[in-house]
From Swiss-Prot:
This is Venom protein E2. GO terms for cellular component: extracellular region. GO terms for molecular function: acetylcholine receptor inhibitor activity; ion channel regulator activity; toxin activity. Belongs to the three-finger toxin family. Short-chain subfamily. Expressed by the venom gland. It is found in: Secreted. Neurotoxin. Blocks muscular nicotinic acetylcholine receptors (nAChR). Disulfide bonds join 3-20, 14-39. Coiled coil: none annotated. Its main location: secreted.
Length: 43
């Protein structure tokens, strides 16, 4: 799964037992930047 977090770094979407790990930064066509996270399972 992929998590998209806005520039404020406060809004992440992950499963309840998931953990977001940042691995890239992308930009949308509207020129707004987003952090790209990979959701990994966690205990």
């Amino acid at each position: 799964l992929i998590c998209y977090v806005s520039r404020d770094g406060k809004t992440a979407t992950c499963p309840p037992q998931g953990k977001c790990e940042k691995y890239a930064v992308s930009a949308s066509h509207t020129x707004h930047x987003f952090y790209v996270y990979g959701c990994t399972s966690x205990c």
